[in-house]
């Protein structure tokens, strides 16, 4: 037995040593490189290492990455060098492809990968034929299809085709450009470049651009080019991967899965070399799923309208809710602007002005009433002669009359009533102002919620597209039935509808804000995100506020203090108080006040301007009166019995007084209830913030595990759909938690009658000082 164990142990040791002795050096031959290409090569190395696993040791010497800079002679020499330095050669690029494809023999296993235009695919030497130590893995690319996509997307008539200068001689586009232009009815021109400056300098002559090249531009260089295109509002399309669209180009017909499929296919080819030691593999076309990818933000910036029909077949990058706005708002700017511009408030302000004028009108009863009059009379001559000068044939005269109230209880009462009603109207305006501010703040947060909802629905749509791909792959591999594919297609349709609705709801949210802010409804606005510990909320210490509410010992006195503050600040109570003052004054008027007399002063000055004709002179026995004379008098009046109206009016005033008192008590109870409700809602939202984070993290992890299990056939579609929907709900809950908390805080502030964001630091400190004083008084 000991002998058997010894032999077995030796066998294991030898086998392990033999496995570890298998080592392969892998080198790369490229047309050009930069940080982006180097990163992709690093990723390919990781994929190869993972696939080969323990079958052998693969080594990637840094000095065996060669670039020829589009020089075919250099590419040929570099290949010969790699033959002597490494065991496996991986090559990429149009020049490299041209050089290696012309060879008859390959001393070392050589893997060539890249793209080939569909119009030039033929059954040639390296397609579907075995060549010792050589395979080419190419994916078809259609310039015609890309240009047609670009034309349909933006409606262009002229397109500049951007390509590296060194690659022109080796790319079929030079041969195809004439036929493509005729077939697609486009004005096409080649725009060669060596660097970003060449591209930018050529943009002024372009209406749209198509990148055949550009893979060798770094991310920062591509962003520079994309910014220049956006500035000139030039749409762009590219053959390069999705990362360039993420950097600002408009669209591509590729997505990230193409690179992943390439790398996996190359890694499998390397594995076959390692395992078999002999490399016999047919060159082949790698068919990948094409998917139109559009940068939503770029489309919006250059003014390209996107059709809803694109949602089903298109992947969107960027943030559709991140728009180029004519105006941007944070919460404070919304609150301050709505005070100044809201039409409801402007209308309510007019009522205040009217009440002010009513008060002025009441006070004007004590101002003198002065009037002037003039007359011209013609009398019958015979009648005039008979009146002895009292009514001459022709008479012109005038008078000035003065009337001045000295004392009037009804006038005094009216002044008091109108003054109280003016103040009541002002409190009604304050109530309306608080309501409109709260409405605008709620609309602001609702817009943020709708924005977050749209982002999440977009992510969920992309997730469903990915799950549909997995279901299709499982169906093709025989791991699941077609029903899974059909189910995800149905889910995709529903998600598309949800996505469209969420986007339109976001636009409606902007419409609501525009209406409240008195902006044109179609004005493009955006709202800045709101976070508790940053921006305008940084100095707005909600954590201390939460601490008072979260502590059961502190909560009761703090809630009582908030109720007291609300009662002191409430414009509803002040409105009722002023109405009560007006009603009491009315009650007094129709009570004892009715026995007070009204005293007034009257005076008049008369003047005869002319007397002529018959009867214009007085007889000698009648003294001639002066042409001008005056009279002054004082009047006193007091109602004795006015059809019992005084008693009835007093009774009405008494009833109204009791009614106002009932309303006041009801409002006080309502305020107390509202404060307590708001405090509980804040506590709910505080816990919701913490729990929603855990909910989202857990749901995400469950989805990832379920997705992997479904991909491997370990779970069914129902479990995957449940996990996806659960994650969707978790995301919605998590993203909205902070906004709902802030809405709850603003609701409490509305009930208190004071918005802290509109206060100064001193005013907020004074609020805290009042609470400490209130608490101290309770403890005493």
Language-model features and meaning:
Residues 20-325:
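Short hydrophobic alpha-helices and adjacent helix-cap/hinge residues
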Residues 270, 338-406, 519, 563-642, ...:
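A small-residue-enriched
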Residues 435-565, 681, 685, 726-727:
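Periplasmic alpha-helical coiled-coil/stalk elements that build and connect Gram-negative outer-membrane
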Residues 317-367, 521, 533-581, 586, ...:
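Bacterial Sec-pathway N-terminal export signals of envelope proteins
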Residues 511-529, 733-780:
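Acidic, low-complexity, intrinsically disordered peripheral segments
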Residues 303, 475-479, 710-714, 751:
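A short glycine-centered flexible hinge/capping loop motif at secondary-structure junctions
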Residues 347-365, 413-459, 466-473, 490-499, ...:
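Extended amphipathic coiled-coil alpha-helical segments
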């Amino acid at each position: 037995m000991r002998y058997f164990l010894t032999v077995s142990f030796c066998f294991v040791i030898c086998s392990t040593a033999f496995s570890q002795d298998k080592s392969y050096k892998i080198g790369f031959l490229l047309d050009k490189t930069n940080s982006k290409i180097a990163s992709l090569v690093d990723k390919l190395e990781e994929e190869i290492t993972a696939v080969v696993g323990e079958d052998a040791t693969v080594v990637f010497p840094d000095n065996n990455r060669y670039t020829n800079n589009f020089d075919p002679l250099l590419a040929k020499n570099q290949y010969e060098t790699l033959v002597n330095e490494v065991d496996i050669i991986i090559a990429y690029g149009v020049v490299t492809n041209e050089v290696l494809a012309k060879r008859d023999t390959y001393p070392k296993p050589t893997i060539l990968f890249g793209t080939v235009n569909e119009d030039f695919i033929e059954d040639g030497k390296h397609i579907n034929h075995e060549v010792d130590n050589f395979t080419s893995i190419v994916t078809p690319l259609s310039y015609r299809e890309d240009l047609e996509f670009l034309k349909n997307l933006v409606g262009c008539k002229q397109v500049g085709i951007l390509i590296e200068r060194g690659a022109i001689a080796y790319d079929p586009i030079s041969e195809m450009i004439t036929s493509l232009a005729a077939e697609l009815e486009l004005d096409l021109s080649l725009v060669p470049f060596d660097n970003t400056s060449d591209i930018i300098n050529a943009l002024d002559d372009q209406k749209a651009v198509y990148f055949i090249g550009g893979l060798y531009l770094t991310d920062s260089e591509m962003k520079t080019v994309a910014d220049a295109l956006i500035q000139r509002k030039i749409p762009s399309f590219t053959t390069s991967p999705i990362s360039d669209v993420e950097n600002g180009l408009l669209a591509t017909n590729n997505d990230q899965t193409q690179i992943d499929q390439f790398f996996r296919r190359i890694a499998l080819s390397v594995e076959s070399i390692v395992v078999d030691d002999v490399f016999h593999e047919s060159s082949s076309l790698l068919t990948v799923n094409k998917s139109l990818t559009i940068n939503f933000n770029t489309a919006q910036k250059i003014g390209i309208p996107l059709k809803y029909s694109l949602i089903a077949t298109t992947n969107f990058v960027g943030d559709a809710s991140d728009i180029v706005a004519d105006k941007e708002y944070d919460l404070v700017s919304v609150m301050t602007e709505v005070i100044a511009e809201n039409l409801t408030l402007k209308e309510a302000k007019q009522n205040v002005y009217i009440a002010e004028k009513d008060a002025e009108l009441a006070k004007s009863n004590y101002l003198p009433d002065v009037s002037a009059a003039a007359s011209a009379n013609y009398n019958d001559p015979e009648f005039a002669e008979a009146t002895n000068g009292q009514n001459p044939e022709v008479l012109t005269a005038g008078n000035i009359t003065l009337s001045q109230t000295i004392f009037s209880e009804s006038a005094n009462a009216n002044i008091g009533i109108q003054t109280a009603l003016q103040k009541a109207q002002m409190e009604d305006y304050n109530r309306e102002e608080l309501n409109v501010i709260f409405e605008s703040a709620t609309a602001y947060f609702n817009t943020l919620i709708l924005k977050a909802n749209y982002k999440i629905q977009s992510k969920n749509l992309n997730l469903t597209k990915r799950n549909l791909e997995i279901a299709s792959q499982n169906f093709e591999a025989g791991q699941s039935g077609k029903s899974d594919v059909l189910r995800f297609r149905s889910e995709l349709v529903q998600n598309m509808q949800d996505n469209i609705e969420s986007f339109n709801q976001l636009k409606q949210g902007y419409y609501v804000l525009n209406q409240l802010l008195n902006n044109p409804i179609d004005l493009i606005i955006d709202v800045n995100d709101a976070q508790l510990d940053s921006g305008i909320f940084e100095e707005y210490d909600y954590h201390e506020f939460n601490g008072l509410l979260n502590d059961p010992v502190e909560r009761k006195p703090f809630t009582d203090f908030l109720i007291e503050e609300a009662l002191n600040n409430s414009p509803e109570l002040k409105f009722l108080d002023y109405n009560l003052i007006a009603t009491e004054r009315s009650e007094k008027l129709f009570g004892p006040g009715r026995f007070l007399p009204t005293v007034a002063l009257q005076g008049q000055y008369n003047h005869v301007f002319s007397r002529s004709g018959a009867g214009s002179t007085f007889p000698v026995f009648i003294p001639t009166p002066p042409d001008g004379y005056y009279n002054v008098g004082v009047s006193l009046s007091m109602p004795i019995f006015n059809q019992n109206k005084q008693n009835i009016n007093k009774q009405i005033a008494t009833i109204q007084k009791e009614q106002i008192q009932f309303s006041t008590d009801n409002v006080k109870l309502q305020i107390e209830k509202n404060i307590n409700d708001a405090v509980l809602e804040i506590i709910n939202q505080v816990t919701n913030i913490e729990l929603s984070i855990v909910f989202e993290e857990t749901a995400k992890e469950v989805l990832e595990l379920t997705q992997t299990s479904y991909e491997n056939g370990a779970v069914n579609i129902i479990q995957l759909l449940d996990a996806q929907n659960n994650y969707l709900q978790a995301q919605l809950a998590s993203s909205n938690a902070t906004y709902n908390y802030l809405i709850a805080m603003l609701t409490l502030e509305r009930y208190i009658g004071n918005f802290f964001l509109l206060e100064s630091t001193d005013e907020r400190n004074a609020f805290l000082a009042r609470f400490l004083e209130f608490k101290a008084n309770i403890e005493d």
